[in-house]
């Protein structure tokens, strides 16, 4: 049974020859972007012979909305606007996925790591500010989360339709 069939069969509750396995970690910050980051993913995959790859979003943690550094009070979140599908933050991640998938030529399933909007917001600000603003004006923060979710949804769609990924790994950590 090939790797892709194994993973997709397991997802569909069908019989597999063995349990699919994959491992991942964050690559070094100083070498996670561009061709070097792409090569890290490919080298790691080939070294461990995993059944699938979780393509990491290393280098793309901070949601780069230019308005976020100007946020001082909770109501300021209402001024956030989506980055849009053509923003370099989104395009760079799609290009990473496409390069990795082109190199693998369908050998295995690939899933791109997408953080939830709360994590994206936290990466661009701070836990303390975010929690204070949630208490002060939850509707303003919810509005901003919806804006970030719009960008995250565009990213998820594009890494599949243009980047060639089989799906996303949706990370729901933070703000517990």
Specify the residue positions occupied by each region the protein language model found.
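Membrane helical hairpin/interfacial module
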Residues: 42-45, 49-62
């Amino acid at each position: 049974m090939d790797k892709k069939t194994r993973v997709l069969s397991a997802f569909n509750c069908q019989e597999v020859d063995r349990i699919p396995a994959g491992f991942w970690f964050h690559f070094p910050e100083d070498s996670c972007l561009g061709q070097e980051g792409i090569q890290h993913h490919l080298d790691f995959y080939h070294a461990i012979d995993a059944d699938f790859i979780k393509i990491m979003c290393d280098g793309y943690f901070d949601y780069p909305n230019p308005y976020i550094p100007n946020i001082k009070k909770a109501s300021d979140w209402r001024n956030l606007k989506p980055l849009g599908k053509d923003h370099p933050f989104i395009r760079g991640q799609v290009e990473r996925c496409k390069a990795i998938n082109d190199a693998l030529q369908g050998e295995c399933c690939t899933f791109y790591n997408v953080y939830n909007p709360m994590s994206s917001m936290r990466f661009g600000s701070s836990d303390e500010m975010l929690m204070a603003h949630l208490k002060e004006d939850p509707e303003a923060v919810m509005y901003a989360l919806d804006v970030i979710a719009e960008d995250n949804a565009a990213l998820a769609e594009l890494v599949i339709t243009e980047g060639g990924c089989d799906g996303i790994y949706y990370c729901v950590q933070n703000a517990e």
